[in-house]
Amino acid sequence: MSSTPNDPWAGLKPDARARLETRDYSSGDLALRLAGGGVNASEAIAGRDQLGDAWIPGVELFQRRVYQQKGRGYFGELTRLTEGTLDRIGLAPRQWASALMHRDSAKGFHIHPPHIPEGIEPAAWFQKLYVESPGDVSQRPYDREQWDVMFFLTGICEMILVDEREGLPRRVMRFTIPGDSRAGPDNAAVVIPSGVAHALRNIGNEDLIMVYGTSTVFNPAWEGRIASDVEKAPLHADWDRYLAGPATI
């Protein structure tokens, strides 16, 4: 990095100048940030129309409003099955559950197998669902595959989605959703189709509590994992050696 009259770093030693890096604080292209370092949920929702091919087909991200109640706390609806996004796409969860993730913990990647009708190639099936007739949600086999809809009550969730469905581009979406305890424009829910790998990381300073619904009841045969070593809690090396048994002489 050469020294010029307008160089703010001219006062540094040459070695430091050679190692110097600066950050780009410009907003940058939304699609690139969605697939890279990530965006806030409200940015993704507001920019959906301009994201085009960067958006994973079938994924829904919709805002939720959390009402602050002075001196008492807050109130937030999760969803209504008779209006809004879940009503529009015809998704009525058959099972509800909750989960807690401690600070700095992570889950994933999890993935559920998509149902492919007999006699149809997977790529042709997804082409029909998401390219030829993306608005015809009646063709989606919600009752034969697991879709998830997730809501966050506390903590801050960083979510990463990867489209692994045959014949569709491998898109990545990365965004952040705060829980209801941090009310604001980024409070949102997310719908994840089968065949889309998903990982969650609690990047807040409190436990993350989530509530999620699934389009079918739990089926252990549909619980896939990809690159999920982050979920393991390995024992200390000394413990592993001890548990392996006495050393042979």
Where are each of the predicted segments found?
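Short beta-strand His + acidic residue motifs that chelate non-heme Fe in jelly-roll/DSBH
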Residues: M159-I160, V190, H198-I203
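Non-catalytic, conserved peripheral segments adjacent to functional cores
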Residues: S2-D186, N205-I209, T214-I249
